[in-house]
Design a protein with these regions (language model features):
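Short aromatic-glycine-(Arg/Gly/Cys) micro-motifs in beta-strand/loop hairpins
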Residues: 1-23
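Generic N-terminal initiation segments characterized by hydrophobic and/or small/turn-forming residues
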Residues: 2-3, 29, 49
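Hydrophobic beta-strand residues in large extracellular and virion-surface proteins
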Residues: 5-6, 35, 65-67
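Solvent-exposed loop/turn segments at secondary-structure junctions
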Residues: 13, 34, 72-74
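Intrinsic disorder/low-complexity signal
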Residues: 15, 19, 25, 70-71, ...
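A short, exposed loop/beta-hairpin motif centered on an aromatic-Gly-Thr core
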Residues: 18-37
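Short, mixed-charge low-complexity intrinsically disordered segments
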Residues: 43-87
């Protein structure tokens, strides 16, 4: 099964042209619409912000949040982002 994952892309660009990003493996979603709804849900956003602060020790400026298929995430960030048995 191919899941959908929420990916936070932070503002700012490193000298090599890359950007810092965070992939939420939990929760993961079964459809794109489910991911988008969750990413825009005012009741859920504080949970994601809290997780980011726990990871980075501070709130980082966010450029954008996207929902990407597990396959796209694995191609971009590597197999450590696989969830269960890939489709």
């Amino acid at each position: 099964m191919n899941y959908w994952l929420m990916v936070v892309i932070f503002a700012g660009v490193y000298a090599d042209g890359t950007q810092e990003a965070y992939v939420f493996k939990d929760p993961h979603f079964h459809t794109l619409n489910e991911c988008v709804r969750n990413a825009n849900d005012p009741n859920e956003i504080p949970k994601y912000a809290k997780k980011l602060v726990a990871e980075y020790g501070r709130m980082m400026q966010i450029q954008k949040v996207v929902c990407a298929s597990q396959d796209e995430v694995i191609k971009t960030f590597g197999s450590k982002y696989a969830i269960g048995d890939p489709a």
